[in-house]
Curated annotation (Swiss-Prot):
This is Shikimate dehydrogenase (NADP(+)). The keyword Cytoplasm does not apply. InterPro entries: Aminoacid_DH-like_N_sf (IPR046346), NAD(P)-bd_dom_sf (IPR036291), SDH_C (IPR041121), Shikimate_DH (IPR011342), Shikimate_DH-bd_N (IPR013708), Shikimate_DH_fam (IPR022893), Shikm_DH/Glu-tRNA_Rdtase (IPR006151). One of its GO terms (molecular function) is NADP binding. Keywords: Amino-acid biosynthesis, Aromatic amino acid biosynthesis, NADP, Oxidoreductase. Homodimer. Shikimate binds at S15, K16, S17, T62, N87, D103, Y216. One of its GO terms (biological process) is chorismate biosynthetic process. It comes from Haemophilus ducreyi (strain 35000HP / ATCC 700724). Its EC number is 1.1.1.25. NADP(+) binds at E78, G127, A128, G129, G130, V131, N150, R151, T152, H153, I154, K155, M214, G239.
Length: 276
């Protein structure tokens, strides 16, 4: 009998997770069923409990339900606890729900794939929301020197204080960032691109920087990456690799095997019409 999985979100029709997980399952001839489920913004918890009651083995969670899924779980990982959000739930043998947040592991795995995860490098993260919260622990454990900058500065300050015991992290306002020396890696973790926007930065910050946008789009044409190309940046990447890698860690949690991501990523790029 095929094991039952799903991704829950609202909206959800755009999700590539069912396709990704079926490709993972094919690597080891596993039988799974993986659906995209539209969560009700009021009755989400009831829906999720019923899904597990009906025999589901695990779920992925996307916006806007990650914090609510975390609160629903019985036990959770440290990364999940720090983020206050879950993107993966697993039904344990005793019926309890275990929550994890694989965003950070997936992000760092993609940086490692790109050979961009270099100890002691200076990293600027734009944004101080849930996505940033989910990736800070593995970044700091990988010895990255992190600077947070956010439109609402106090949110970046509070986040830096929360994670200070795990590594080198500071908050710098967007108005002060103009005085900062160049960064080795600049990460866009804002949601501005969904409305076609981005945070413009002084050109000198890009002088030797690689740029990673956690959003993804056909041909890597997110608003932020379109902008940084005009600033002369030649090393850039969108978040599709992060999506595939975080999915791989979810699959490992459920099925006990870490799938290979490179061919899956290539297939996704081809499906999206990526042209080198």
């Amino acid at each position: 009998m095929a094991r039952q999985y799903a991704v829950w979100g609202n909206p959800i029709a755009h999700s590539k997770s069912p396709y990704i997980h079926q490709l993972f399952a094919q690597q080891s001839n596993r039988r799974i069923e993986y659906a995209a489920k539209l969560g009700d913004k009021i009755a989400f918890e009831k829906q999720l409990v019923q899904f597990f009651t009906d025999g589901a083995n695990g779920v992925n969670i996307t916006s806007p339900f990650k914090a609510r899924a975390f609160r629903l779980a019985d036990v959770c990982s440290e990364s999940c606890l720090l983020a206050g959000a879950a993107n993966t739930l697993k039904r344990l043998d005793d019926g309890r729900l275990f929550a994890d947040n694989t965003d950070g592991k997936g992000f760092c795995a993609d940086l490692a794939r790109l050979e961009w995860l270099i100890p002691e490098q200076r990293v600027l993260i734009l944004g101080a929301g849930g996505v940033t919260k989910g990736v800070l622990l593995p970044l700091l454990l990988a010895k990255q020197k992190v600077t947070l900058s956010n439109r609402t500065h106090i949110k970046a300050v509070e986040l830096a204080q929360q994670f200070a015991k795990y590594g080198d992290i500071q908050a710098v306002s967007l108005s002060e960032i103009v005085q900062h020396p160049p960064f080795d890696l600049i990460i866009n973790a804002t949601s501005l691109g969904l409305q076609g926007g981005y945070i413009a930065l002084p050109n000198h910050l890009f002088e030797k920087s690689a740029v990673y946008d956690m959003e993804y789009a056909s041909n890597m044409c997110t608003p932020f990456l379109n902008y940084v190309r005009t600033q002369g940046v030649t090393r850039y990447q969108d978040g599709l690799g992060m999506l595939v890698n975080q999915a791989a860690f979810s699959f490992q949690l459920w099925e006990g095997e870490l799938p290979k991501v490179e061919n899956v990523l290539k297939q996704l790029r081809a499906e999206m019409g990526y042209v080198k």
